[in-house]
């Protein structure tokens, strides 16, 4: 039998929103396999589909800037929210964004080696900022996009940089539409542009989970297939940007809204500070230990 720790229960609870004891049971039944435990809870109707990268933990900020041809979205991390709101830190983030936009490096490693306008490497520039600010700071990730003439960038920053979104639309130069789409993405967090982008493996996995879920609900086998078909269609529309009801006008989809301007979404990047990075453990572990040991 796998050793089920308090941290594992905590992680599963955060990913699924299920109760503590349900999470413990799911982990026991699946011998500690996190992904199988998520499926177990979903099949039992206890949890909804979990996003793989919904564990937001570290501090920092995202930033988005652009020029006529290129745009960059990046994330810079710090240790505390206090520093993330500091003017010096925000100036650092802006300087790094401008550097990456100007140089357009291929990788994070290349970016850290590039030379800032003052002659320092980006790495040395960050190291100097660490000394001044007094916290560990790191350039975590970035993406650079290029656009053609008949295209538009959409930039949106939410909650003072907690979430940063960059969209690229082709077939239109309407930056208002592009920004509206970026705002929608910040709020709804779609996984794909179109349902056609969803892999056959993911579709097959979801169909398997939904089938087991319907059978566990006691539905007759002869209607399970039709139920699964409807639920799968709903799932695909929920994770696909073009099919989602537009946040500013739910009567139309995002795809329909963009089409009104003659455009089409060709790419988007959504960074949320700390996605997938775990913080130090807090008192929650103590809270669940007594439950796990029962």
Swiss-Prot record:
Database matches in PROSITE patterns: EF_TS_1, EF_TS_2
What keywords are assigned to this protein? Cytoplasm, Elongation factor, Protein biosynthesis
Location comes to: Cytoplasm
Q: What is its main location?
A: cytoplasm
Q: Which SUPFAM superfamilies does the UniProt record give?
A: Elongation factor Ts (EF-Ts), dimerisation domain (SSF54713), UBA-like (SSF46934)
Q: Which GO terms describe its cellular component?
A: cytoplasm
Name of the coding gene:
tsf
Q: What is this protein called?
A: Elongation factor Ts
Q: Annotated region Involved in Mg(2+) ion dislocation from EF-Tu: where?
A: 80-83
InterPro entries per record: EF-Ts_dimer_sf, Transl_elong_EFTs/EF1B, Transl_elong_EFTs/EF1B_dimer, Transl_elong_Ts_CS, UBA-like_sf
One Pfam family assigned to this protein is EF_TS
Protein's job? Associates with the EF-Tu.GDP complex and induces the exchange of GDP to GTP. It remains bound to the aminoacyl-tRNA.EF-Tu.GTP complex up to the GTP hydrolysis stage on the ribosome.
Q: Does the keyword Cytoplasm apply?
A: yes
Family the UniProt entry places it in: Belongs to the EF-Ts family.
> Which GO terms label this protein's molecular function in UniProt?
translation elongation factor activity
